[in-house]
Amino acid sequence: MANLAKATGKLKSVDYEVFGRVQGVCFRMYTEDEARKLGVVGWVKNTRQGTVTGQVQGPEDKVNSMKAWLSRVGSPSSRIDRIDFNDEKEITKLQYNGFSTRY
């Protein structure tokens, strides 16, 4: 049986932080929904600095789709001013079973 990486291409992991009007606008809920639709795993949470941060893992193409969504779409009432992606790397296995909101 082929593992997920061989079946779907390289597995990637990336950390992100979204700046702008991203708290109090259901950004985390929409992020969790989009991640589940795309089939990526990881987490999302609000920060004390007024940003939203998290991590996404999955097949490279799906992680790239999630990065694009985080950069340009977000929740309907959000305003994304900037997003920083950090520690993007290839991984051998997923570290999460699903996508969740952290508090």
From Swiss-Prot:
Keywords: Hydrolase. PROSITE patterns: ACYLPHOSPHATASE_1 (PS00150), ACYLPHOSPHATASE_2 (PS00151), ACYLPHOSPHATASE_3 (PS51160). It comes from Xenopus tropicalis. This is Acylphosphatase-2. The active site is at 28, 46. It is an enzyme of class 3 (hydrolase). Its EC number is 3.6.1.7. Residues 13-103 form the Acylphosphatase-like domain.
